[in-house]
Amino acid sequence: MTSRWAISVDESLNCIFVKWGRNPSLEDTRQYFETLVGLPAFRAGAHMFNDLRALAPDLPASFFRQAARFGPTTPAAGQKLALLVSSEVAFGLMRIFATFRQRPGLEVDVFDDLEQARKWLGLPADIGDPFEDMADDNPVSDSNRTEAR
């Protein structure tokens, strides 16, 4: 089975960047969360910045409710999760996910603007688009990739 995400950790920015492909499955999501909780940066409280701009807008709302259940139940205090989308439909679907993903110590917000998400996470302006150098749709959909920057 192929998975549909790639992870890049930038410890200097205290941030985990995740780029999602078009059609993740619930199994992809489960594997992502298993990988995420194993990262030292996650356990240390790094913020998470998810690029969901390629996400297919035809996934049912029930997918996002179920996917949120796979996430860790005990995030580090003060962690933030930014969800970046590219359409109004995706914005609404990720709001559903955000509602179910909220935990004490974890702030979740949905953005349709890269700069607003970057500012909310406290990332410097000079980083540009942190997902630009990550794998495009085809490589992301072929395998999971975790790398350190």
Where does each model-flagged region fall?
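Amphipathic, Lys/Arg-enriched alpha-helical "gate/interface" segment within cytosolic domains
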Residues: M1-R149
